[in-house]
């Protein structure tokens, strides 16, 4: 692959790259509990000391960065993935990061009275709200369920769309905004949900966990 250029090395589990107008890329470093900026010439600088386990990142309609924070994981030598929650783990969260200062502000830590477990990825719709996945947390003998949610960027509203799900990871909308795709990593499935309006999915059938169909 001669057409691939390595711009930066030494990043701690990089995720959620966002291309910025100035040509730089802002990304998350889950293992280092921060967001970093990489310039076109490969220079890396700290952007936000957001803490926890910063995961998915996206620019919102107001120009701010919106972050899925999984709360932090425990890493063991020989394993690239987290092996349970970090000792300081309390819950996951959704944060807004100021694009100028890098200051992180908490938007959501709970839904329906329950703590978020490990928010993973998000995507904005044309109405200005965003869908996001919660991967759940894996423990030695059990795990928290994952789920799919919809929220407003001003912190005013968060609703559950699908719960429980095994391990919802990446998510994205079709070009016409009528289909929401969700990758289920451990289930080795790609789910497609029919979008009937901002934050509204096709109702599920009785006894079904959600209304998604396998692609």
Regions found by a protein language model. Name each.
Residues 1-215:
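Sequence-structural signature of mature extracellular/luminal beta-sheet repeat domains
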């Amino acid at each position: 692959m001669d057409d691939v250029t390595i711009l930066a090395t030494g990043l701690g589990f990089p995720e959620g790259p966002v291309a910025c107008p100035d040509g730089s890329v802002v990304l998350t470093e889950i293992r280092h509990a921060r967001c970093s900026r990489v310039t076109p010439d490969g220079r890396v600088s700290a952007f936000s000391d957001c803490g926890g386990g910063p995961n998915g990142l996206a620019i919102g309609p107001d120009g701010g960065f919106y972050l899925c924070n999984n709360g932090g994981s425990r890493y063991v030598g020989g394993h690239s993935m987290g092996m349970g929650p970090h000792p300081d783990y309390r819950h996951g969260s959704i944060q807004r990061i100021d694009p100028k200062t890098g200051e992180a502000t908490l938007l959501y830590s709970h839904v329906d009275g329950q703590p978020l477990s490990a928010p993973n990825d998000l995507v904005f719709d044309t109405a200005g709200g965003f869908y996001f996945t919660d991967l759940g947390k894996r423990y030695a003998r059990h795990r928290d369920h994952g789920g799919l949610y919809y929220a407003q960027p001003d912190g005013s509203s968060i609703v559950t769309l699908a719960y429980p799900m095994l391990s919802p990871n990446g998510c994205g909308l079709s070009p016409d905004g009528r289909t929401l795709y969700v990758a289920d990593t451990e289930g080795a499935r790609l789910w497609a949900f029919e979008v009937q309006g901002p934050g509204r999915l096709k109702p599920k059938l009785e006894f079904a966990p959600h209304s998604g169909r396998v692609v």
